[in-house]
Amino acid sequence: MQHIKHMRTAVRLARYALDHDETPVACIFVHTPTGQVMAYGMNDTNKSLTGVAHAEFMGIDQIKAMLGSRGVVDVFKDITLYVTVEPCIMCASALKQLDIGKVVFGCGNERFGGNGTVLSVNHDTCTLVPKNNSAAGYESIPGILRKEAIMLLRYFYVRQNERAPKPRSKSDRVLDKNTFPPMEWSKYLNEEAFIETFGDDYRTCFANKVDLSSNSVDWDLIDSHQDNIIQELEEQCKMFKFNVHKKSKV
């Protein structure tokens, strides 16, 4: 499944963020027609001390730098965003206004989720959207490598965060590797959309509120340091940019 392939890349980038003292939330922007990675982002709130420096905005800035503001509007309908954690309400609104094609995410955002957990910004009718966007929303697919995304967040929150306004006592921080909340598919998809997305073989996952994969977590993926991920992504983004310029000259 292409979704798993691309989400693995996003998870690797989130692990890199964790190793650099950032909240482990990361994303990649994939050009859907070609399957090429065109931009990436990870949270930068700790380093920048900027509350809006979310992974999605970091990637959007890369696309703007590459294509210009007008180019962003033209290309976003052909982009699939893979992000380890459900976009917050702010990011979900920005993605909708940019007319993004699709969002695929790992785990829900229990406090600020904008794709179904708290609000369904991607489907509401009040957010401003481009005039040519008759659908007034975007498709959102949850639960891809969900447990891996949850575990990276747990790794972060059991650490001492010096920038937290009220640091928790170390004795209160216990790493849980065994239990996970139910996967509430119905918050994001109805059963018909779920089956259309994942296939009838997974129908019972919807009813039983369980993950698509087995109960195991890919520990190798989330426990390995990802020192080369930035270089890999930079090379992929350069290749996409090269192909864009090559096409524009034809």
UniProtKB/Swiss-Prot annotation:
Note: Present with 830 molecules/cell in log phase SD medium.
Gene Ontology cellular component annotations, sorted alphabetically: cytoplasm; nucleus; tRNA-specific adenosine-34 deaminase complex
Record's subcellular location: Cytoplasm; Nucleus
Reported function: Structural subunit of tRNA-specific adenosine deaminase, which deaminates adenosine-34 (the first, also called wobble position of the anticodon) to inosine in many tRNAs. Inosine-34 allows the decoding of 3 different nucleotides at the third position of mRNA codons, as inosine is able to pair with U, C, and A.
Catalytic activity: adenosine(34) in tRNA + H2O + H(+) = inosine(34) in tRNA + NH4(+)
Annotated residues for binding of Zn(2+): 54, 88, 91
Sequence similarity: Belongs to the cytidine and deoxycytidylate deaminase family. ADAT2 subfamily.
Keyword set, alphabetical order: Cytoplasm, Hydrolase, Metal-binding, Nucleus, tRNA processing, Zinc
GO BP field: tRNA modification; tRNA wobble adenosine to inosine editing
PANTHER family: CYTOSINE DEAMINASE FAMILY MEMBER, TRNA-SPECIFIC ADENOSINE DEAMINASE 2
Cofactor dependence: Zn(2+)
Domain of life where this protein originates: Eukaryota
Main subcellular location: cytoplasm
EC number(s) from the headed UniProt entry: 3.5.4.33
Location of the active site: 56
Species the sequence originates in: Saccharomyces cerevisiae (strain ATCC 204508 / S288c)
Domain (CMP/dCMP-type deaminase): residue spans on this chain: 1-119
Classification lineage: Eukaryota, Fungi, Dikarya, Ascomycota, Saccharomycotina
Protein name, UniProt field: tRNA-specific adenosine deaminase subunit TAD2
Assembly notes: Heterodimer with TAD3.
Name of the coding gene: TAD2
GO molecular function: tRNA-specific adenosine deaminase activity; tRNA-specific adenosine-34 deaminase activity; zinc ion binding
